[in-house]
Amino acid sequence: MRRMSHTKLHTRRLGLTVLLLILCSVLLVSCMAGPNAMWIRGIFGLDVNDYFAEAPLRQLQPDGTVAALLSNMVGIIVSDSIHLTPFSGTSEAVRIYRDAILNDMLRDDYSRYTGNRQAINSVSRVYPYLSTSTLIAKDDFENVVFRYFGGTSVSHKSGTAFSYLSRAGYYTSPLQARECVAEVEIRELYETEHTYRMQFVLTANGETSDIYTAVFVKRNDGSCYWKALR
């Protein structure tokens, strides 16, 4: 009887291991999409609340304090268009609205992010041929994302309007901050156990958007953050 060489035996074992990992991955994905999804996600420490399914506890006034807060949070993702792209969760929100968030930061605190000599000197040491006066530190961007969109980690990438200077840790743009041209018109606003759920439209230049539904998760300190837009 011929004996299998050590190399062939090792290759076969490696192949079986890879096959087993693939099967486990397929099984895990099917569980995440099936009836056991909530249980599986809970094991991994993911948010398992179905916020859209929460029953309304009370209706809030569209001209009240909460309404004003949420309208301002809508303004963070609005710049020069009344048409918004739906999202769910922090990562997707940042991927879609990175430029809009940075633009809102520049718009709200122009003097902080323009002409900051300390930031300019820091960047020029790493990018000596780059001439820019607009710089937003990645830490500032992360703080804004955590405050208004939740999450625990933020990716940093260049967008269309803002470029990420990875070696210096700053965002920069040659463009001026765009003003928010749209008005938020609230159609319905409800409070649930864990959220505020708001239906609204955007209006600008005589045009009105489709009706959007936004869900904001409440924090214990009275603040809230974006969860989803539909």
Regions found by a protein language model. Name each.
Residues 1-52, 216:
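Gram-positive cell-envelope targeting signals
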Residues 5, 10-19, 23-24, 53-56, ...:
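Terminal low-complexity, poorly structured segments
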Residues 8, 34, 38, 54-56, ...:
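Intrinsic disorder/low-complexity segments
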Residues 42, 46-47, 58, 209-230:
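Short beta-strand edge/turn micro-motifs at domain boundaries
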Residues 46-170:
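Core segments of small alpha/beta cavity-forming domains
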Residues 106, 200-206, 218-220:
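Short, flexible beta-strand-to-coil junctions
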Residues 152-159, 204-211, 230:
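Generic structural signal for short, solvent-exposed loop/turn connectors between secondary structure elements
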Residues 162-208:
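Acidic, glycine-rich flexible loop segments
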